[in-house]
């Protein structure tokens, strides 16, 4: 009889909670309600109700079953318990948007079934961005744009209630096998911070070419926040995991190319002292705008102060080398590139730049050495940004040129074939193939 009464009260409690979902959400979604339930976790009834509340809040935060034809009426995170009987963590997606009507649906289609709530902060859209977001039951907030990406992102993060949060841009998308890879990571992040590959550009065949690794998923209780008005980032701390689920950046239209530089210049005029990362990215913006002489002292100050992250230090040496090369100072360019070895092993892109300088000077054996090294180091783990073609296609096609100039036609043809294996249907490879065929015919 006592057991029947207990079951009755369980059922009655559930019924009351279901009928008062708004109150439950408002109370228990807040910090006070959460810690109230946690404080009575050892009480079986309270613990049972807390577990049920998490399920209920999951439904309230992410009613996507009807929005985009979810086949199951039960959210994916609660289809089954994780190992040990504990439920999978709740995931909040945090985004900032402005006039992203054309791409937002594509992004959310690729990730909506992996998250439990969508936080969307709009910084001043004048198109139908909000209407698109509403189709996915996103929680939409307005945030006046103040030339500070971190401020907007941190506002979005502050609205999240999940155990973990992740960020995406509206023109990002989770494609192909990466969707399932991300699902597995989100089911059990097993770290405070998870880094994921970021595919920033692609060749004609769709192969990623510009790649970086970005901090992407965070344990909310750690209080992580972005820093930097432009090229914002979260400083790594706590336990870190490196996942293999890549995020693809598929921009449809180029944005304002001067926006970031203008923000940096505005900050300088206000008297702001740049952090090391801001120094580095300010120099990058100057380089992108062809202001090579202006970029060089910024890069030198960044390296001299010695407070930058290792990938940024290597990147600064690469940028300085390119600036000197554009200014027709090859010796200074070479010194800057060799300086990068103070911060780590030779990177493929650095090796290709050095090889290119030797090739311009018609020092073919030296150039070939560095292109060989680019291929050999291309299989090493990379940090920061890297160009995939510098690991395979570019050094191979340049080795073809080097060996041809040195008179080793068979080796040159072999490296041309290797380049073709990395980039199918490449025009340069086809031209070289015809060139070697004609050369062989003349020898006969």
Locate predicted features:
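Short beta-strand/loop segment that forms part of the nucleotide-sugar
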Residues: 116-124, 141
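Catalytic-site signature of metal-activated, phosphate-bearing donor transferases
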Residues: 151-157, 174-301
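Short, well-formed alpha-helical segments that are part of the catalytic scaffolds
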Residues: 95-114
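Conserved donor nucleotide-binding strand/loop of the catalytic core
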Residues: 131-155, 159
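Short aromatic/hydrophobic "clamp" motif used to bind/position activated sugar donors
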Residues: 165
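Acidic helix N-cap motif at the loop->helix transition within catalytic regions
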Residues: 105, 127-136, 177
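Cell-envelope/extracellular polymer assembly enzymes that use nucleotide-activated donors
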Residues: 90-92
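A conserved acidic beta->alpha catalytic loop
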Residues: 110, 122-131, 145, 169
């Amino acid at each position: 009889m006592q057991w029947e009464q207990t079951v009755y009260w369980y059922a009655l409690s559930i019924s009351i909670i279901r009928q008062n979902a708004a109150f439950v959400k408002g109370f228990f979604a807040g910090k006070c309600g959460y810690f109230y339930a946690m404080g009575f976790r050892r009480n079986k009834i309270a613990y049972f109700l807390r577990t049920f509340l998490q399920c209920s809040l999951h439904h309230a935060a992410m009613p996507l079953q009807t929005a985009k034809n979810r086949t199951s009426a039960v959210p994916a995170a609660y289809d089954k318990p994780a190992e040990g009987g504990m439920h999978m963590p709740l995931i909040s997606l945090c985004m900032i948007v402005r006039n992203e009507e054309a791409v937002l649906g594509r992004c959310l289609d690729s990730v909506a079934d992996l998250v439990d709530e969508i936080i969307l902060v709009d910084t001043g859209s004048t198109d139908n961005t909000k209407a698109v977001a509403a189709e996915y039951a996103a929680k939409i907030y307005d945030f006046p744009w103040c030339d500070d990406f971190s401020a907007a992102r941190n506002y979005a993060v502050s609205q999240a209630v999940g155990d973990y949060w992740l960020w995406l841009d509206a023109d990002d998308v989770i494609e192909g096998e990466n969707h399932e890879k991300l699902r597995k990571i989100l089911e059990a992040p097993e770290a405070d911070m998870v880094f994921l590959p970021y595919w920033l550009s692609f060749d004609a065949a769709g192969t990623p070419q510009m790649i970086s690794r970005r901090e992407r998923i965070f344990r909310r209780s750690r209080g992580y926040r972005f820093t930097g008005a432009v090229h914002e980032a979260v400083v790594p701390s706590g336990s870190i995991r490196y996942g293999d689920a890549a995020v693809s950046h598929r921009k449809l239209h180029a944005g304002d190319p001067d926006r970031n530089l203008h923000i940096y210049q505005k900050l300088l005029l206000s008297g702001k002292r740049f952090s090391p990362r801001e120094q580095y990215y300010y120099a990058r913006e100057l380089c992108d705008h062809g202001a090579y002489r202006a970029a060089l002292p910024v890069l030198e100050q960044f390296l001299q102060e010695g407070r930058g992250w290792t990938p940024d230090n290597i990147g600064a040496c690469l940028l300085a080398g390119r600036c000197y090369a554009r200014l027709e100072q090859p010796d200074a360019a070479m010194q800057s590139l060799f300086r990068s070895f103070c911060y780590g092993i030779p990177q493929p892109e650095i090796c290709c730049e050095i090889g290119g300088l030797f090739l311009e000077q018609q020092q073919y054996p030296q150039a070939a050495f560095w292109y060989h090294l680019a291929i050999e180091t291309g299989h090493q783990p990379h940090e920061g940004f890297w160009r995939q073609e510098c690991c395979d296609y570019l050094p191979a096609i340049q080795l073809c040129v080097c060996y041809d100039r040195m008179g080793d036609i068979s080796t040159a043809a072999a490296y041309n074939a290797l380049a073709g294996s990395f980039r199918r249907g490449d025009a340069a490879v086809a031209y070289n193939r015809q060139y070697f065929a004609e050369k062989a015919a003349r020898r006969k």
